[in-house]
UniProtKB/Swiss-Prot annotation:
It comes from Methanobrevibacter smithii (strain ATCC 35061 / DSM 861 / OCM 144 / PS). Residues 1-207 form the RNase H type-2 domain. SUPFAM superfamilies: Ribonuclease H-like. Keywords: Cytoplasm, Endonuclease, Hydrolase, Manganese, Metal-binding, Nuclease. This is Ribonuclease HII. Transmembrane segments: none annotated. InterPro entries: RNase_H2_suA, RNase_HII/HIII, RNase_HII/HIII_dom, RNase_HII_arc, RNase_HII_hlx-loop-hlx_cap_dom, RNaseH-like_sf, RNaseH_sf. Gene3D superfamilies: Ribonuclease H-like superfamily/Ribonuclease H, Ribonuclease hii. Domain 2. Manganese or magnesium. Binds 1 divalent metal ion per monomer in the absence of substrate. May bind a second metal ion after substrate binding. Pfam families: RNase_HII. NCBIfam families: ribonuclease HII. The gene is rnhB. GO terms for biological process: DNA replication, removal of RNA primer; mismatch repair. Its cofactor is Mn(2+); Mg(2+).
Length: 207
């Protein structure tokens, strides 16, 4: 049975898009992925991730959903939380690729609830588990593509801000990202900043 793996990158970032990737791995091709060294993207070097992502895109059918910072802010303003934003993105991929079975990294604290919602909305046989990117090689493959795609977006944005010291990884814990944000007032924030994030809201309240 062909299996679709889905994972995301950039969920907690204050800068840049949330990227969701889906990869269909044909039956028995998981052995090939193991030989290629496919594992959770966070355990790979950026260079290795780039190489593997290119190979995976050539070898397998895949799909990407890129949700911009502005779209995230707009949806949150409409009362749609981050888990729902991710679910909507995953459902687009499930609809586009229409697999026999899908395995996804559960974003809801209750994995079974998330699994049932995806399955009911799409009619696809879905398995949703926490840490699926560690436990299922199909999800690891999706993780690699999602992370590489997001890294490419961040690198492109960074080009315009090198003279300011760069934007860092885009995550709130990154000192370079924190420093970058201090260059702007809340109203001056570039459109790739998630203004609805607590990190930025705190800056607004302190100005």
């Amino acid at each position: 049975m062909d299996v679709l793996g889905i994972d995301e990158a950039g969920r907690g970032s204050v800068l840049g898009p949330l990227v969701i990737a889906g990869v269909i791995v044909p039956e028995k091709m998981d052995i090939v992925l193991e030989r290629m060294g496919v594992k959770d993207s966070k355990r790979l070097t950026p260079n290795r991730r780039t190489i593997l992502s290119r190979k995976l895109k050539k070898m397998f059918e895949y799909d990407l959903v890129v949700i911009s910072a502005q779209d995230i802010d707009n949806m949150r303003a409409d009362g749609i939380n981050l888990n729902e934003i991710e679910r909507i993105g995953m459902e687009k991929i499930l609809s586009n690729l229409n697999p026999e079975k899908a395995i996804v990294d559960a974003v809801d604290i209750k994995a079974e609830r998330f699994q049932n919602k995806l399955a009911n909305d799409t009619g696809v046989n879905v398995v949703a588990e926490h840490k699926a990117d560690d436990n299922y090689i199909e999800v690891s493959a999706a993780s690699i593509i999602a992370k590489q795609e997001r890294d490419a977006h961040i690198a492109e944005i960074n080009k315009d801000y090198i003279k300011m010291g760069g934007i860092g990884s885009g995550y709130p814990s990154d000192p370079i990202t924190k420093k970058f944000l201090t260059n702007f007032t809340y109203d001056e924030m570039p459109d790739f900043v998630r203004k609805s994030w607590a990190t930025v809201e705190k800056m607004k309240n302190s100005q």
